[in-house]
Swiss-Prot record:
Catalyzes the methylthiolation of N6-(dimethylallyl)adenosine (i(6)A), leading to the formation of 2-methylthio-N6-(dimethylallyl)adenosine (ms(2)i(6)A) at position 37 in tRNAs that read codons beginning with uridine. SUPFAM superfamilies: Radical SAM enzymes. Its cofactor is [4Fe-4S] cluster. It comes from Bacillus cereus (strain ZK / E33L). Residues 440-503 form the TRAM domain. Residues 1-15 have a biased composition (Polar residues). Residues 16-25 have a biased composition (Basic and acidic residues). This is tRNA-2-methylthio-N(6)-dimethylallyladenosine synthase. One of its GO terms (molecular function) is 4 iron, 4 sulfur cluster binding. [4Fe-4S] cluster 2 binds at residues 221, 225, 228. Belongs to the methylthiotransferase family. MiaB subfamily. It is an enzyme of class 2 (transferase).
Length: 509
Protein backbone atom coordinates (compact mmCIF):
# COMPACT_ATOMS: atom_id res chain seq x y z
CA UNK A 1 0.00 0.00 0.00
CA UNK A 2 1.47 3.36 -1.00
CA UNK A 3 1.18 6.73 0.77
CA UNK A 4 -1.74 7.82 -1.40
CA UNK A 5 -3.70 4.72 -0.37
CA UNK A 6 -2.86 5.33 3.28
CA UNK A 7 -4.12 8.90 3.12
CA UNK A 8 -7.27 7.72 1.38
CA UNK A 9 -7.90 5.18 4.12
CA UNK A 10 -7.49 7.81 6.82
CA UNK A 11 -10.01 10.08 5.07
CA UNK A 12 -12.53 7.26 4.95
CA UNK A 13 -12.16 6.74 8.71
CA UNK A 14 -12.63 10.41 9.56
CA UNK A 15 -16.06 10.03 11.24
CA UNK A 16 -16.49 9.09 14.90
CA UNK A 17 -16.80 5.49 16.07
CA UNK A 18 -20.33 6.07 17.28
CA UNK A 19 -21.55 6.92 13.78
CA UNK A 20 -22.66 4.34 11.23
CA UNK A 21 -19.84 3.68 8.77
CA UNK A 22 -19.71 2.31 5.25
CA UNK A 23 -16.85 -0.14 5.77
CA UNK A 24 -16.88 -1.23 2.13
CA UNK A 25 -15.46 2.16 1.09
CA UNK A 26 -12.52 1.62 3.40
CA UNK A 27 -11.76 -1.81 2.04
CA UNK A 28 -11.90 -0.58 -1.54
CA UNK A 29 -8.77 1.45 -0.89
CA UNK A 30 -6.68 -0.91 1.21
CA UNK A 31 -8.17 -4.37 1.21
CA UNK A 32 -9.43 -7.04 -1.12
CA UNK A 33 -11.46 -9.97 0.22
CA UNK A 34 -10.29 -13.51 -0.54
CA UNK A 35 -10.67 -14.28 -4.24
CA UNK A 36 -9.31 -17.46 -5.79
CA UNK A 37 -9.39 -15.94 -9.27
CA UNK A 38 -7.55 -12.77 -8.28
CA UNK A 39 -5.09 -14.53 -5.99
CA UNK A 40 -3.89 -16.83 -8.76
CA UNK A 41 -2.99 -13.80 -10.92
CA UNK A 42 -0.50 -12.58 -8.37
CA UNK A 43 2.48 -14.59 -9.64
CA UNK A 44 3.25 -11.81 -12.10
CA UNK A 45 3.80 -9.25 -9.36
CA UNK A 46 7.38 -8.33 -8.57
CA UNK A 47 8.70 -9.01 -5.08
CA UNK A 48 11.44 -6.69 -3.87
CA UNK A 49 14.06 -7.48 -1.25
CA UNK A 50 14.63 -4.73 1.30
CA UNK A 51 17.92 -5.28 3.13
CA UNK A 52 18.01 -2.39 5.57
CA UNK A 53 15.40 -2.03 8.30
CA UNK A 54 16.10 1.12 10.22
CA UNK A 55 14.20 3.37 12.63
CA UNK A 56 13.94 7.06 11.72
CA UNK A 57 15.04 9.60 14.30
CA UNK A 58 11.42 10.33 15.27
CA UNK A 59 11.14 6.84 16.79
CA UNK A 60 14.22 6.97 19.00
CA UNK A 61 13.13 6.25 22.60
CA UNK A 62 9.52 6.23 21.37
CA UNK A 63 8.61 3.47 23.82
CA UNK A 64 10.82 4.42 26.75
CA UNK A 65 8.97 3.81 30.01
CA UNK A 66 6.29 1.72 28.31
CA UNK A 67 5.66 -2.03 28.26
CA UNK A 68 4.29 -4.40 25.60
CA UNK A 69 2.54 -7.76 25.73
CA UNK A 70 2.02 -10.10 22.73
CA UNK A 71 -0.26 -13.14 22.84
CA UNK A 72 0.40 -15.57 19.99
CA UNK A 73 -2.01 -18.04 18.43
CA UNK A 74 -1.32 -20.62 15.74
CA UNK A 75 1.70 -21.92 13.89
CA UNK A 76 5.47 -21.55 14.14
CA UNK A 77 5.34 -18.77 11.54
CA UNK A 78 3.22 -16.74 13.94
CA UNK A 79 5.66 -17.52 16.76
CA UNK A 80 8.47 -16.17 14.61
CA UNK A 81 6.46 -13.09 13.63
CA UNK A 82 6.00 -12.42 17.34
CA UNK A 83 9.78 -12.59 17.81
CA UNK A 84 10.15 -9.95 15.09
CA UNK A 85 7.50 -7.68 16.60
CA UNK A 86 9.13 -8.06 20.02
CA UNK A 87 12.40 -7.03 18.39
CA UNK A 88 10.79 -3.92 16.93
CA UNK A 89 9.18 -3.03 20.27
CA UNK A 90 12.56 -3.41 21.99
CA UNK A 91 14.26 -1.25 19.35
CA UNK A 92 11.65 1.42 20.08
CA UNK A 93 12.53 1.33 23.79
CA UNK A 94 9.58 -0.72 25.07
CA UNK A 95 10.06 -3.39 27.72
CA UNK A 96 8.26 -6.77 27.69
CA UNK A 97 5.76 -7.79 30.34
CA UNK A 98 4.03 -11.10 31.01
CA UNK A 99 0.82 -9.45 32.25
CA UNK A 100 -1.81 -7.56 30.28
CA UNK A 101 -2.49 -5.57 33.47
CA UNK A 102 1.00 -4.02 33.32
CA UNK A 103 1.07 -3.45 29.56
CA UNK A 104 0.79 -0.18 27.67
CA UNK A 105 0.32 -2.09 24.40
CA UNK A 106 -1.38 -5.48 23.98
CA UNK A 107 -1.15 -7.28 20.63
CA UNK A 108 -3.03 -10.46 19.68
CA UNK A 109 -1.12 -12.22 16.89
CA UNK A 110 -3.89 -14.31 15.40
CA UNK A 111 -4.47 -17.53 13.46
CA UNK A 112 -7.18 -18.06 10.82
CA UNK A 113 -6.68 -21.74 10.03
CA UNK A 114 -9.77 -22.90 11.98
CA UNK A 115 -12.90 -21.32 13.43
CA UNK A 116 -11.95 -22.34 16.97
CA UNK A 117 -8.78 -20.24 16.77
CA UNK A 118 -10.81 -17.18 15.77
CA UNK A 119 -13.32 -17.74 18.57
CA UNK A 120 -10.48 -17.72 21.12
CA UNK A 121 -9.33 -14.32 19.85
CA UNK A 122 -12.79 -12.76 20.05
CA UNK A 123 -13.13 -14.21 23.54
CA UNK A 124 -9.86 -12.56 24.56
CA UNK A 125 -10.97 -9.25 23.02
CA UNK A 126 -14.03 -9.43 25.27
CA UNK A 127 -11.80 -9.80 28.34
CA UNK A 128 -9.62 -6.89 27.22
CA UNK A 129 -12.64 -4.59 26.96
CA UNK A 130 -12.87 -4.37 30.76
CA UNK A 131 -9.14 -3.68 30.97
CA UNK A 132 -9.52 -0.86 28.46
CA UNK A 133 -12.24 0.71 30.61
CA UNK A 134 -9.89 0.73 33.60
CA UNK A 135 -6.98 1.96 31.52
CA UNK A 136 -8.18 4.13 28.60
CA UNK A 137 -4.59 4.82 27.50
CA UNK A 138 -3.98 1.12 26.82
CA UNK A 139 -3.43 0.36 23.11
CA UNK A 140 -5.00 -2.91 21.92
CA UNK A 141 -4.07 -4.38 18.54
CA UNK A 142 -5.04 -7.35 16.39
CA UNK A 143 -2.52 -8.62 13.85
CA UNK A 144 -1.71 -11.84 12.02
CA UNK A 145 -3.80 -13.97 9.69
CA UNK A 146 -7.27 -13.06 10.99
CA UNK A 147 -6.57 -9.45 10.07
CA UNK A 148 -6.32 -10.46 6.40
CA UNK A 149 -10.01 -11.50 6.38
CA UNK A 150 -12.49 -8.76 5.53
CA UNK A 151 -15.32 -10.31 7.58
CA UNK A 152 -13.09 -10.44 10.66
CA UNK A 153 -11.97 -6.82 10.37
CA UNK A 154 -15.59 -5.74 9.86
CA UNK A 155 -16.58 -7.59 13.03
CA UNK A 156 -13.75 -5.99 14.99
CA UNK A 157 -14.65 -2.48 13.82
CA UNK A 158 -18.37 -2.95 14.47
CA UNK A 159 -18.40 -4.94 17.72
CA UNK A 160 -14.95 -4.42 19.28
CA UNK A 161 -14.43 -0.69 19.06
CA UNK A 162 -12.02 -0.78 21.98
CA UNK A 163 -9.45 -2.17 19.52
CA UNK A 164 -7.03 0.60 18.51
CA UNK A 165 -5.17 -0.99 15.60
CA UNK A 166 -5.50 -3.81 13.09
CA UNK A 167 -2.72 -4.82 10.73
CA UNK A 168 -1.94 -7.87 8.64
CA UNK A 169 0.85 -10.31 7.89
CA UNK A 170 2.50 -8.31 5.10
CA UNK A 171 3.40 -5.10 6.93
CA UNK A 172 4.81 -6.10 10.31
CA UNK A 173 7.84 -3.93 9.51
CA UNK A 174 5.53 -0.88 9.67
CA UNK A 175 4.70 -1.50 13.35
CA UNK A 176 6.37 1.77 14.54
CA UNK A 177 4.17 3.86 12.24
CA UNK A 178 1.03 1.90 13.15
CA UNK A 179 1.76 2.40 16.86
CA UNK A 180 2.27 6.12 16.37
CA UNK A 181 -0.97 6.47 14.40
CA UNK A 182 -2.90 4.49 17.03
CA UNK A 183 -1.46 6.56 19.86
CA UNK A 184 -2.64 9.86 18.41
CA UNK A 185 -5.81 8.78 16.59
CA UNK A 186 -9.35 8.66 17.94
CA UNK A 187 -10.16 6.04 15.32
CA UNK A 188 -9.22 2.40 14.95
CA UNK A 189 -6.10 2.38 12.78
CA UNK A 190 -6.44 -0.33 10.14
CA UNK A 191 -3.57 -1.07 7.79
CA UNK A 192 -4.21 -4.30 5.93
CA UNK A 193 -2.41 -4.84 2.65
CA UNK A 194 -4.10 -7.08 0.11
CA UNK A 195 -0.85 -7.32 -1.86
CA UNK A 196 1.70 -9.49 -0.13
CA UNK A 197 4.68 -7.62 1.19
CA UNK A 198 8.24 -7.63 0.00
CA UNK A 199 10.98 -9.68 1.66
CA UNK A 200 12.42 -7.53 4.46
CA UNK A 201 15.85 -8.58 5.71
CA UNK A 202 17.64 -7.60 8.93
CA UNK A 203 14.49 -7.11 10.99
CA UNK A 204 15.25 -7.02 14.72
CA UNK A 205 14.23 -10.12 16.69
CA UNK A 206 13.88 -11.07 20.32
CA UNK A 207 14.06 -14.85 20.23
CA UNK A 208 12.26 -16.87 22.89
CA UNK A 209 15.37 -18.75 23.94
CA UNK A 210 19.04 -19.25 23.18
CA UNK A 211 18.94 -22.98 22.37
CA UNK A 212 16.58 -23.29 19.40
CA UNK A 213 15.68 -20.75 16.72
CA UNK A 214 13.14 -20.32 13.93
CA UNK A 215 14.47 -19.13 10.57
CA UNK A 216 12.09 -18.14 7.78
CA UNK A 217 13.32 -19.31 4.40
CA UNK A 218 10.17 -18.39 2.47
CA UNK A 219 6.75 -16.83 2.86
CA UNK A 220 3.32 -17.58 1.45
CA UNK A 221 1.78 -20.48 -0.44
CA UNK A 222 0.59 -20.96 -4.02
CA UNK A 223 -1.03 -24.39 -3.67
CA UNK A 224 -4.64 -23.23 -3.08
CA UNK A 225 -5.97 -26.36 -1.42
CA UNK A 226 -9.74 -25.91 -1.49
CA UNK A 227 -10.10 -25.84 2.32
CA UNK A 228 -7.19 -23.55 3.17
CA UNK A 229 -7.17 -19.81 3.85
CA UNK A 230 -3.35 -19.53 4.06
CA UNK A 231 -2.70 -18.55 0.39
CA UNK A 232 -4.99 -15.57 0.98
CA UNK A 233 -3.72 -14.55 4.42
CA UNK A 234 -0.01 -15.14 3.77
CA UNK A 235 0.22 -14.27 0.08
CA UNK A 236 2.17 -15.81 -2.76
CA UNK A 237 5.34 -17.84 -2.37
CA UNK A 238 8.40 -15.62 -1.87
CA UNK A 239 11.80 -17.15 -1.14
CA UNK A 240 14.64 -15.49 0.74
CA UNK A 241 17.99 -15.54 -1.00
CA UNK A 242 20.15 -18.50 0.09
CA UNK A 243 23.08 -16.29 1.08
CA UNK A 244 20.87 -14.36 3.52
CA UNK A 245 19.56 -17.57 5.11
CA UNK A 246 23.02 -19.12 5.44
CA UNK A 247 24.42 -15.92 6.95
CA UNK A 248 21.62 -15.81 9.55
CA UNK A 249 22.15 -19.45 10.52
CA UNK A 250 25.93 -19.04 10.77
CA UNK A 251 25.32 -16.08 13.07
CA UNK A 252 22.98 -18.15 15.25
CA UNK A 253 25.52 -20.98 15.39
CA UNK A 254 28.23 -18.52 16.43
CA UNK A 255 25.94 -17.35 19.24
CA UNK A 256 25.56 -20.85 20.65
CA UNK A 257 22.25 -22.02 19.20
CA UNK A 258 22.03 -25.79 18.85
CA UNK A 259 18.96 -26.31 16.66
CA UNK A 260 17.41 -24.44 13.73
CA UNK A 261 13.95 -24.99 12.28
CA UNK A 262 13.53 -23.69 8.73
CA UNK A 263 10.06 -22.21 8.30
CA UNK A 264 7.69 -21.79 5.39
CA UNK A 265 4.00 -22.35 4.73
CA UNK A 266 5.18 -24.75 2.01
CA UNK A 267 8.85 -25.03 2.83
CA UNK A 268 9.87 -27.43 0.07
CA UNK A 269 8.62 -25.06 -2.62
CA UNK A 270 11.63 -22.97 -1.61
CA UNK A 271 13.46 -21.46 -4.58
CA UNK A 272 10.81 -22.17 -7.21
CA UNK A 273 10.20 -18.44 -7.59
CA UNK A 274 13.85 -17.66 -8.34
CA UNK A 275 14.32 -16.50 -11.92
CA UNK A 276 18.11 -16.13 -11.97
CA UNK A 277 19.19 -19.45 -10.39
CA UNK A 278 18.02 -23.05 -10.14
CA UNK A 279 18.14 -23.63 -6.41
CA UNK A 280 15.75 -25.58 -4.19
CA UNK A 281 15.39 -26.80 -0.63
CA UNK A 282 17.65 -29.77 -1.33
CA UNK A 283 20.44 -27.41 -2.41
CA UNK A 284 19.96 -25.24 0.66
CA UNK A 285 19.96 -28.23 3.03
CA UNK A 286 23.12 -29.55 1.38
CA UNK A 287 24.89 -26.26 2.14
CA UNK A 288 23.52 -26.11 5.68
CA UNK A 289 25.04 -29.54 6.38
CA UNK A 290 28.39 -27.72 6.42
CA UNK A 291 27.34 -25.23 9.11
CA UNK A 292 28.65 -25.97 12.61
CA UNK A 293 25.29 -26.45 14.30
CA UNK A 294 23.93 -29.63 15.87
CA UNK A 295 20.50 -29.94 14.29
CA UNK A 296 18.54 -28.58 11.35
CA UNK A 297 14.91 -29.44 10.70
CA UNK A 298 12.16 -27.90 8.57
CA UNK A 299 8.38 -27.47 8.51
CA UNK A 300 5.87 -27.64 6.88
CA UNK A 301 6.37 -29.67 3.72
CA UNK A 302 3.91 -30.48 0.94
CA UNK A 303 4.08 -33.98 -0.62
CA UNK A 304 3.65 -32.48 -4.08
CA UNK A 305 6.98 -30.62 -3.86
CA UNK A 306 9.03 -33.24 -2.00
CA UNK A 307 11.56 -34.13 -4.70
CA UNK A 308 14.20 -36.85 -5.06
CA UNK A 309 17.11 -34.45 -4.62
CA UNK A 310 15.83 -33.36 -1.19
CA UNK A 311 15.44 -37.01 -0.16
CA UNK A 312 18.99 -37.75 -1.33
CA UNK A 313 20.41 -34.83 0.69
CA UNK A 314 18.44 -35.74 3.83
CA UNK A 315 19.82 -39.26 3.52
CA UNK A 316 23.33 -37.86 4.10
CA UNK A 317 22.40 -37.24 7.74
CA UNK A 318 24.86 -35.24 9.81
CA UNK A 319 23.05 -32.27 11.31
CA UNK A 320 19.95 -32.92 9.16
CA UNK A 321 17.50 -34.68 11.49
CA UNK A 322 15.49 -37.81 10.66
CA UNK A 323 12.08 -36.36 11.56
CA UNK A 324 9.86 -35.33 8.63
CA UNK A 325 6.41 -33.79 9.04
CA UNK A 326 4.52 -34.68 5.86
CA UNK A 327 0.82 -33.68 5.91
CA UNK A 328 -1.35 -36.13 3.97
CA UNK A 329 -4.79 -34.72 4.97
CA UNK A 330 -6.65 -37.78 3.59
CA UNK A 331 -5.90 -41.34 2.50
CA UNK A 332 -8.49 -41.23 -0.28
CA UNK A 333 -7.43 -40.23 -3.78
CA UNK A 334 -10.96 -38.97 -4.45
CA UNK A 335 -10.87 -36.75 -1.37
CA UNK A 336 -7.38 -35.52 -2.21
CA UNK A 337 -8.61 -34.48 -5.65
CA UNK A 338 -11.53 -32.51 -4.18
CA UNK A 339 -9.08 -30.92 -1.72
CA UNK A 340 -6.86 -29.94 -4.72
CA UNK A 341 -3.82 -31.51 -3.08
CA UNK A 342 -2.50 -32.50 -6.54
CA UNK A 343 -1.25 -35.95 -5.52
CA UNK A 344 -2.84 -39.37 -5.06
CA UNK A 345 -2.75 -41.96 -2.31
CA UNK A 346 -0.35 -43.99 -4.46
CA UNK A 347 1.96 -41.01 -5.00
CA UNK A 348 2.10 -40.35 -1.26
CA UNK A 349 2.88 -43.98 -0.43
CA UNK A 350 5.63 -44.04 -3.07
CA UNK A 351 7.11 -40.87 -1.56
CA UNK A 352 7.10 -42.51 1.88
CA UNK A 353 8.81 -45.58 0.42
CA UNK A 354 11.58 -43.42 -1.08
CA UNK A 355 12.09 -41.54 2.20
CA UNK A 356 12.32 -44.73 4.25
CA UNK A 357 14.71 -46.27 1.74
CA UNK A 358 17.05 -43.26 1.90
CA UNK A 359 16.60 -42.69 5.66
CA UNK A 360 15.92 -46.10 7.29
CA UNK A 361 15.35 -44.60 10.76
CA UNK A 362 13.10 -41.77 9.53
CA UNK A 363 10.21 -40.76 11.78
CA UNK A 364 7.15 -39.49 9.91
CA UNK A 365 4.33 -37.39 11.36
CA UNK A 366 1.35 -35.91 9.55
CA UNK A 367 -1.82 -33.77 9.52
CA UNK A 368 -5.25 -35.26 8.80
CA UNK A 369 -8.65 -33.65 8.22
CA UNK A 370 -11.77 -35.72 8.90
CA UNK A 371 -15.31 -34.81 7.91
CA UNK A 372 -14.39 -32.93 4.74
CA UNK A 373 -17.62 -32.13 2.82
CA UNK A 374 -19.30 -35.33 1.60
CA UNK A 375 -16.56 -37.65 2.88
CA UNK A 376 -17.95 -41.21 2.75
CA UNK A 377 -17.36 -44.03 5.20
CA UNK A 378 -15.24 -45.78 2.57
CA UNK A 379 -13.08 -42.69 2.04
CA UNK A 380 -12.54 -42.32 5.77
CA UNK A 381 -11.54 -46.00 6.00
CA UNK A 382 -8.93 -45.30 3.30
CA UNK A 383 -7.43 -42.69 5.61
CA UNK A 384 -7.36 -45.19 8.46
CA UNK A 385 -5.67 -47.83 6.31
CA UNK A 386 -3.08 -45.38 4.98
CA UNK A 387 -2.23 -44.35 8.54
CA UNK A 388 -1.55 -47.99 9.42
CA UNK A 389 0.38 -48.65 6.21
CA UNK A 390 2.72 -45.67 6.63
CA UNK A 391 3.09 -46.24 10.37
CA UNK A 392 3.17 -42.59 11.44
CA UNK A 393 4.60 -41.84 14.87
CA UNK A 394 1.86 -39.32 15.54
CA UNK A 395 -0.52 -36.91 13.83
CA UNK A 396 -2.34 -33.62 14.25
CA UNK A 397 -6.00 -34.43 13.58
CA UNK A 398 -8.88 -32.05 12.97
CA UNK A 399 -12.53 -31.93 12.01
CA UNK A 400 -12.89 -29.86 8.83
CA UNK A 401 -13.51 -26.18 9.59
CA UNK A 402 -15.00 -24.04 6.76
CA UNK A 403 -13.04 -20.88 5.97
CA UNK A 404 -14.92 -18.05 4.30
CA UNK A 405 -13.65 -17.31 0.80
CA UNK A 406 -12.32 -20.82 0.10
CA UNK A 407 -13.95 -23.14 -2.48
CA UNK A 408 -14.65 -25.85 0.12
CA UNK A 409 -16.74 -23.45 2.20
CA UNK A 410 -19.24 -23.31 -0.68
CA UNK A 411 -19.55 -27.09 -1.00
CA UNK A 412 -22.71 -28.81 0.18
CA UNK A 413 -21.98 -31.16 3.04
CA UNK A 414 -24.10 -34.21 3.85
CA UNK A 415 -21.92 -35.52 6.69
CA UNK A 416 -23.60 -34.92 10.10
CA UNK A 417 -21.40 -33.46 12.85
CA UNK A 418 -22.05 -36.53 15.00
CA UNK A 419 -20.49 -38.70 12.28
CA UNK A 420 -17.50 -36.36 11.97
CA UNK A 421 -16.89 -36.48 15.72
CA UNK A 422 -17.14 -40.28 15.74
CA UNK A 423 -14.60 -40.51 12.91
CA UNK A 424 -12.24 -38.18 14.75
CA UNK A 425 -12.50 -40.34 17.89
CA UNK A 426 -11.73 -43.49 15.89
CA UNK A 427 -8.77 -41.84 14.17
CA UNK A 428 -7.39 -40.50 17.44
CA UNK A 429 -7.66 -43.95 19.00
CA UNK A 430 -5.52 -45.30 16.15
CA UNK A 431 -3.06 -42.40 16.49
CA UNK A 432 -2.69 -43.08 20.22
CA UNK A 433 -2.31 -46.83 19.69
CA UNK A 434 0.50 -46.44 17.15
CA UNK A 435 2.15 -43.65 19.18
CA UNK A 436 2.64 -45.85 22.24
CA UNK A 437 3.75 -48.79 20.06
CA UNK A 438 6.37 -46.58 18.40
CA UNK A 439 7.56 -45.16 21.70
CA UNK A 440 7.78 -48.61 23.31
CA UNK A 441 10.53 -49.46 20.83
CA UNK A 442 12.77 -46.85 22.45
CA UNK A 443 12.90 -48.71 25.77
CA UNK A 444 16.47 -49.63 26.58
CA UNK A 445 17.87 -47.45 23.79
CA UNK A 446 20.34 -44.62 24.36
CA UNK A 447 19.20 -41.45 22.60
CA UNK A 448 20.70 -38.02 22.02
CA UNK A 449 18.67 -35.32 23.78
CA UNK A 450 18.89 -31.56 23.42
CA UNK A 451 17.93 -30.28 26.87
CA UNK A 452 15.30 -27.52 26.64
CA UNK A 453 14.78 -26.83 30.33
CA UNK A 454 12.72 -27.95 33.30
CA UNK A 455 9.76 -30.27 32.77
CA UNK A 456 6.41 -28.45 32.74
CA UNK A 457 5.09 -30.94 35.30
CA UNK A 458 8.06 -31.17 37.66
CA UNK A 459 10.82 -28.54 38.08
CA UNK A 460 13.13 -31.23 39.50
CA UNK A 461 13.06 -33.03 36.14
CA UNK A 462 14.70 -31.87 32.91
CA UNK A 463 13.03 -32.17 29.51
CA UNK A 464 14.39 -32.19 25.99
CA UNK A 465 13.91 -33.61 22.52
CA UNK A 466 15.59 -36.28 20.42
CA UNK A 467 16.59 -35.77 16.80
CA UNK A 468 13.26 -37.40 15.88
CA UNK A 469 11.35 -34.88 18.03
CA UNK A 470 10.52 -37.26 20.90
CA UNK A 471 10.03 -35.55 24.27
CA UNK A 472 12.30 -37.09 26.93
CA UNK A 473 12.06 -36.42 30.70
CA UNK A 474 14.97 -37.29 33.02
CA UNK A 475 16.65 -36.22 36.25
CA UNK A 476 19.90 -34.30 35.80
CA UNK A 477 21.64 -31.09 36.91
CA UNK A 478 20.11 -27.88 35.58
CA UNK A 479 23.57 -26.92 34.32
CA UNK A 480 22.88 -29.24 31.38
CA UNK A 481 20.09 -27.03 30.00
CA UNK A 482 21.05 -26.10 26.46
CA UNK A 483 23.41 -29.06 26.09
CA UNK A 484 23.29 -32.29 24.07
CA UNK A 485 23.36 -35.34 26.35
CA UNK A 486 22.92 -39.11 26.13
CA UNK A 487 19.86 -40.57 27.90
CA UNK A 488 18.84 -44.22 28.29
CA UNK A 489 15.09 -44.65 27.83
CA UNK A 490 13.51 -46.51 30.76
CA UNK A 491 9.79 -45.96 30.19
CA UNK A 492 7.53 -45.02 27.28
CA UNK A 493 4.26 -43.10 27.33
CA UNK A 494 1.95 -42.08 24.51
CA UNK A 495 3.47 -38.63 24.05
CA UNK A 496 6.80 -38.81 25.87
CA UNK A 497 9.69 -40.95 27.09
CA UNK A 498 11.31 -41.20 30.52
CA UNK A 499 14.99 -41.92 30.91
CA UNK A 500 18.23 -41.79 32.87
CA UNK A 501 21.24 -39.63 32.12
CA UNK A 502 24.09 -41.69 30.69
CA UNK A 503 26.59 -39.22 29.32
CA UNK A 504 27.03 -35.43 29.23
CA UNK A 505 27.55 -33.25 27.31
CA UNK A 506 28.11 -34.22 23.66
CA UNK A 507 30.53 -32.22 21.56
CA UNK A 508 29.15 -31.16 18.16
CA UNK A 509 31.52 -32.21 15.38
Amino acid sequence: MNEQQRLASQQVNSSTKKEEKDYSKYFESVYQPPSLKEAKKRGKEEVKIERDFGLPEEFRNFGTGRKFYIRTYGCQMNEHDTEVMAGIFTALGYEPTFSTEDADVVLLNTCAIRENAENKVFGELGHLKALKRRNPDLLIGVCGCMSQEESVVNKIMQKNQHVDMVFGTHNIHRLPYILKDAMFSKETVVEVWSKEGDVIENLPKVRRGDIKAWVNIMYGCDKFCTYCIVPYTRGKERSRRPEDIIQEIRHLAANGYKEITLLGQNVNAYGKDFEDIEYGLGDLMDELRKVDIARIRFTTSHPRDFDDHLIEVLGKGGNLVEHIHLPVQSGSTEMLKIMARKYSREHYLELVRKIKEAIPNAVLTTDIIVGFPNETDEQFEETMSLYREVGFDTAFTFIYSPREGTPAAKMKDNVPMEVKKERLQRLNALVNKLAIEKNDRYKGQIVEVLVDGESKNNPEVLAGYTRTNKLVNFVAPKSLIGQLVKVKVTDAKTWSLNGELVEEPIEVE
